[in-house]
Swiss-Prot record:
The gene coding this protein: WNT2
Protein localization: Secreted, Extracellular space, Extracellular matrix; Secreted
UniProt keyword terms in alphabetical order: Developmental protein, Disulfide bond, Extracellular matrix, Glycoprotein, Lipoprotein, Secreted, Signal, Wnt signaling pathway
Keyword Lipoprotein included in the entry's annotation: yes
UniProt-recorded name of the protein: Protein Wnt-2
Organism phylogeny: Eukaryota, Metazoa, Chordata, Craniata, Vertebrata
O-palmitoleoyl serine-type lipidated residues: S212
Family: Belongs to the Wnt family.
The record's account of how the chain is modified after translation: Palmitoleoylation is required for efficient binding to frizzled receptors. Depalmitoleoylation leads to Wnt signaling pathway inhibition.
Disulfide bonds: C76-C87, C127-C135, C137-C157, C206-C220, C208-C215, C278-C309, C294-C304, C308-C348, C324-C339, C326-C336, C331-C332
Described function: Ligand for members of the frizzled family of seven transmembrane receptors. Functions in the canonical Wnt signaling pathway that results in activation of transcription factors of the TCF/LEF family. Functions as a upstream regulator of FGF10 expression. Plays an important role in embryonic lung development. May contribute to embryonic brain development by regulating the proliferation of dopaminergic precursors and neurons.
Residues bearing glycans: N295
GO biological process terms, semicolon-separated: atrial cardiac muscle tissue morphogenesis; canonical Wnt signaling pathway; cardiac epithelial to mesenchymal transition; cardiac muscle cell proliferation; cell fate commitment; cell proliferation in midbrain; cell-cell signaling; cellular response to transforming growth factor beta stimulus
Length: 360
């Protein structure tokens, strides 16, 4: 091989590394990695050195994070259940979502936020349940306190959300902090918005003590709300996400359109418009909507017109078993009958383009 060609071949792997976009949060794959924490730490691809160090030092926290992946991906799928892109995950893909999140879109903003929130939630819950050696209940919630109802004593186990946020920041943001590009700044912003969203729904719960429930004495603690509240909140932020561009010195954002308000730390931000997700597309990672169930009577995103992108739909007649004729029997059971229900199911037609059958 002559010298110029040989030089090109030597540089080719490095050029491909520079030019190929990468989904940063390979730690998402921790939920799919079985075995011990050590096996998980060594086999999740793409972790930076500080993430691997935290992984080996805190195997109990990593187990919590791994279990939490299932929870936040399920919440993502719930929020997008009626949309063309439904937060579907890919088996044996360490990025979990494939090429879809390479684009700096609203969907990427939401996934980074909900995943960061999921880590905070999972770690904080594990602390309260005594599953993490390095943390427990919130040590600051001791002694007495006061609210609109009067004085109370801190007791029980207040969720140590500050520990969850601190660990999540150190672990999740580690790879983004190594990068100085626009996408890294976008991810860091949305990660922070996700962490803050969990703390927003921290609520005070109390138990009354006293003669005949007089509540002359109260014991209170702080508890995280159900993760659905965080998911609903971030969904609203997704719908109000703000498109931005990098400022001139490359240190932050400015709005892409002067009509938009400046994003706060609680807002989600994105750079690129989303694809329509109508058809399978190798470049964008879209799986398309062929075969998706649609709602014939809806006028929303789940309608057959919108979901199927104007391609039409097929209708199949199916029967399913449901509970019916339920009656309450004293005391204390509800008994139901099993009934067959006939219904029509509408699914989106595939495009006529033969390329549809090609795998992504």
């Amino acid at each position: 091989m002559n010298s110029p060609l040989r030089g090109i071949w030597l540089w080719l792997p490095l050029l491909l590394t520079w030019l190929t976009p990468e989904v940063s949060s390979s730690w998402w794959y921790m939920g799919a990695t079985g075995g011990s924490a050590r096996v998980m730490c060594d086999n999740v691809p793409g972790l930076v050195s500080s993430q691997r160090q935290l992984c080996h030092r805190h195997p109990d926290v990593m187990r919590a994070i791994g279990l939490g992946v299932t929870e936040w991906t399920s919440e993502c799928q719930y929020q997008f259940r009626q949309h063309r892109w439904n937060c579907n995950t890919l088996d044996r893909d360490h990025s979990l979502f494939g090429r879809v999140l390479l684009r700096s879109s609203r969907e990427s903003a939401f996934v980074y936020a909900i995943s960061s929130a999921g880590v905070v939630f999972a770690i904080t819950r594990a602390c309260s349940q005594g599953e993490v050696k390095s943390c427990s209940c919130d040590p600051k919630k001791m002694g007495s306190g006061k609210d609109s109802k009067g004085v109370f004593d801190w007791g029980g186990c207040s969720d140590n959300i500050d520990y969850g946020i601190k660990f999540a920041r150190a672990f999740v943001d580690a790879k983004e902090r190594k990068g100085k590009d626009a996408r890294a700044l976008m991810n860091l912003h949305n990660n922070r918005a996700g962490r803050k969203s969990v703390k927003r729904f921290l609520k005070q719960e109390c138990k009354c003590h006293g003669v005949s429930g007089s509540c002359s004495l109260r014991t209170c603690w702080l508890a995280m709300a159900d993760f659905r509240k965080t998911g609903d909140y971030l969904w609203r932020k997704y719908n109000g996400a703000i498109q931005v561009v990098m400022n001139q010195d490359g240190t932050g954002f400015t709005v892409a359109n002067e009509r938009f308000k400046k994003p706060t730390k609680n807002d989600l931000v994105y750079f690129e418009n989303s694809p329509d997700y109508c058809i399978r597309d190798r470049e964008t990672g879209s799986l398309g909507t062929a075969g998706r169930v649609c709602n014939l009577t809806s006028r929303g995103m789940d309608s057959c017109e919108v979901m199927c992108c104007g391609r039409g739909y097929d209708t199949s007649h199916v029967t399913r078993m449901i509970k019916c004729g339920c009656k309450f029997h004293w005391c204390c059971a509800v008994r139901c009958q099993d009934c067959l229900e006939a219904l029509d199911v509408h699914t989106c037609k595939a495009p006529k383009n033969a390329d549809w059958t090609s795998p992504t």
